[in-house]
Amino acid sequence: MTIVRKPQWLQKKINPAAHAGMEGLLGELRLHTVCQEARCPNITECFRERQATFLILGAACTRLCSFCNVTKQTPIPPDPGEPDRVAEAIRRLGLSHVVITSPTRDDLPDGGAGHYAETVAAIRSASPATTVELLIPDYLGNRESLARVVASAPAIIGHNVETVPRLYQIRAGADYGRSLGVLRTLRELDPVVRSKSGIMLGLGEAEEEVLAVFADLRSVGCSYLSIGQYLAPSKSHHPVREFIPPECFERYRAAALATGFAHVESGPYVRSSYHAARYDGQL
């Protein structure tokens, strides 16, 4: 297999020394972030600015997606004290906007939806001015779980399609149609919900496939979109097939906006929660 080398313009430096303050707070409160667990390349930038995407419901996932660095092992039961600790961290950090996500928890009857709702309620109590964005799994398409999340009334609810339908073998246990169904159901449950999705590029997708995903997302009422470059966390993960140049991301951004998205972030380092407050500014 040919190894695609990372171009010079995609070399982002990570400075662990800049993480100390945030890591101290997270350690004290026994919290996880997707920034750490997913080996996000933006971690230094975000931690330096005292921003973080909180990972609730533990750090172990019940699925085996070949692109993801989150641990694949038997998950622990939900921690009933976690919502309050997340809320305390947000209060101390003084966050105006926060993103909450989790591993997929197919082992739980509601997929963890109730824990999400409890976390939103705790944040509202501790930090009423903070707007909350949730990035949720598919809950196996369970409408009751989705209704529980919608009823918690976050500012934005995200669910990522991740890639084009042809490449869905990288998402073990997922289904493209089901993910579109999640976004459709969110809109059915709350016609004014602000929904969001994300797609990674560089996995071998064709441009026409990407544009078709944009159209599919708009057809189910998706409001916001993030487009970023896939970066393999390690050699054992799914390989990068192509590094997409910045000008292509700009072209995709223009195409997505033309289909009717209210806001689009598109660039090599864009991730679902990267610059998340920019989407919130569209509310």
UniProtKB/Swiss-Prot annotation:
Enzyme Commission number(s) from the entry: 2.8.1.8
Quote the record's binding site residues for [4Fe-4S] cluster 1. Answer: 35, 40, 46, 273
| Signal peptide residues on this chain, from the entry's feature table | none
Keyword Chaperone assigned: no
Named from the GO MF annotations, one term is: metal ion binding
One GO cellular component term: cytoplasm
Q: In which pathway does it act?
A: Protein modification; protein lipoylation via endogenous pathway; protein N(6)-(lipoyl)lysine from octanoyl-[acyl-carrier-protein]: step 2/2
Cofactor(s) the record lists: [4Fe-4S] cluster
Class in the EC hierarchy, top level: transferase
**Keyword entries, A-Z:** 4Fe-4S, Cytoplasm, Iron, Iron-sulfur, Metal-binding, S-adenosyl-L-methionine, Transferase
What family is this?
A: Belongs to the radical SAM superfamily. Lipoyl synthase family.
- What is the protein's given name? Lipoyl synthase
Recorded source organism is Geobacter metallireducens (strain ATCC 53774 / DSM 7210 / GS-15)
Its lineage reads: Bacteria, Pseudomonadati, Thermodesulfobacteriota, Desulfuromonadia, Geobacterales
